[in-house]
């Protein structure tokens, strides 16, 4: 057997398992896609947001652990400054799900939605493909 033939046997092949965007895909189950969700806050909901924030964080832990919520956070009118109250504008989240409808259901069940923080009529769910993923700190 030639050296090149032996190398091709020993070298792992990702052919057929990597999409055009460099993401590994699996042959079983429906393919999940990423969605960018923008959830604006309703007016004058800062106190409600603060009150339910711990419940929100507990509620998203399973979504993070399962990979359904790989990234997310608050959006602001301007960057927060120490000593000044933050001017929240809403939330932005990347979800991994099969459909936009699945994402909408996750959003509707979040405590920020059920307590009236997010304006569900103005939620945007957009198809999303990440080109770069880097941790905040290295």
Describe every region a protein language model picked out.
Residues 2-10:
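Fungal secretory targeting signals
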Residues 2, 15-138:
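Conserved, structured core segments of small domains
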């Amino acid at each position: 057997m030639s050296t090149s033939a032996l190398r091709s046997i020993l070298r792992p092949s990702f052919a057929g398992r990597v999409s055009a965007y460099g993401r590994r895909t699996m042959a079983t189950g429906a393919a999940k896609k990423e969605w960018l969700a923008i959830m604006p806050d309703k007016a004058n909901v800062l106190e409600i947001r603060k009150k339910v924030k711990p419940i929100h964080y507990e509620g998203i832990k399973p979504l993070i652990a399962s990979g359904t919520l790989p990234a997310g956070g608050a959006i602001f009118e301007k960057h927060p400054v120490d000593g000044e109250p933050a001017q929240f504008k809403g939330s932005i989240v990347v979800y991994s799900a099969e459909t936009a409808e699945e994402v909408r259901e996750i959003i509707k069940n979040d405590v920020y939605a059920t307590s009236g923080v997010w304006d569900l009529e103005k939620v945007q769910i957009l198809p999303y493909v990440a080109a770069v993923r880097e941790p905040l700190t290295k």
